[in-house]
């Protein structure tokens, strides 16, 4: 026991307490090894973090020379819950059925088809704004018996209207519009043939026949009418 001359009891108290351990006696934390085997065998690796970022998406690019206000509406984008995270939403494209062709013309063959399969809607990006579908120009194939009867009626009269045209169409099992278009085309052909024959006769005498303004206007008016009434069959 140690005794202090100044504090006699100091040595007594020092003797009652156990000796403090040295720094060398403290437990040491094992050093971490950074070799491959040690890293692979670790069980305290942090779990991989799941990316919580929302996926970015962009609507489809418009065709060249068209803006988003001019092209048809893109597929609808719906918000669907992400698997495993019901509270988080992810934007995913989902194609909705398109509307049918709204062409009001009863002769349109595309009525009832999906507008995405309509030839006019697929080729023209503005067709859904520009009104009814424009019908293709397809000529009617007449039978020899029908042509013979039509030519016979044309020799009688170049214009057929009213009940006569309706009766002729019913007799030949044709529509009234088909008969009307045939007579219009036949009149144009007859005018061209007559003009060529007239020019051929006058050319024998060295005379060149100029086209008259009345004939040109008449032909132009007939051709424009033909464009308006020609139908798809």
From Swiss-Prot:
Record field: compositional bias (Acidic residues): 220-233
Disordered, as annotated region: 212-233
Distribution of this protein across tissues and organs: Localized to the dorsal lip of the blastopore (Spemann organizer) during early gastrulation, after which expression continues in tissues derived from the organizer. Expressed in the notochord during mid-gastrulation, the chordoneural hinge, notochord and ventral spinal cord of the tailbud at stage 22, and finally the tip of the tail in the tadpole (stage 35).
Example of a GO biological process term: neuron differentiation
GO cellular component: nucleus
UniProt cross-references to PANTHER family, sorted A to Z: GNOT1 HOMEODOMAIN PROTEIN-RELATED, HOMEOBOX PROTEIN EMX-RELATED
Name of the protein in its database record: Homeobox protein not2
Gene assigned in the entry: not2
């Amino acid at each position: 026991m140690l005794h202090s001359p100044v504090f006699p009891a100091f040595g007594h108290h020092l003797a009652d307490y156990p000796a403090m351990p040295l720094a060398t006696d403290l437990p040491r934390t094992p050093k971490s090894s950074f070799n491959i085997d040690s890293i692979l065998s670790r069980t305290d690796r942090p779990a991989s973090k799941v990316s919580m970022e929302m996926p970015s998406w962009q609507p489809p690019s418009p065709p060249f020379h068209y803006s988003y206000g001019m092209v048809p509406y893109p597929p609808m984008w719906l918000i669907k819950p992400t698997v495993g995270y019901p509270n988080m939403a992810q934007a995913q494209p989902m194609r909705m059925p398109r509307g049918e062709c709204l062409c009001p013309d009863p002769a349109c063959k595309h009525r009832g088809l999906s507008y995405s399969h309509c030839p006019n809607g697929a080729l023209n990006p503005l067709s859904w704004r520009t009104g009814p579908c424009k019908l293709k120009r397809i000529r009617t194939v007449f039978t020899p018996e029908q042509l013979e009867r039509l030519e016979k009626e044309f020799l009688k009269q170049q214009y057929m209207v009213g009940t006569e045209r309706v009766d002729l169409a019913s007799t030949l099992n044709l529509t009234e519009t088909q008969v009307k278009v045939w007579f219009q085309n036949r009149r144009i052909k007859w005018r061209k043939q007559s003009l060529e024959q007239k020019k051929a006769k006058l050319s024998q005498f060295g005379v060149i026949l100029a086209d008259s303004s009345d004939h040109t206007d008449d032909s132009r008016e007939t051709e424009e009418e033909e464009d308006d009434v020609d139908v798809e069959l």
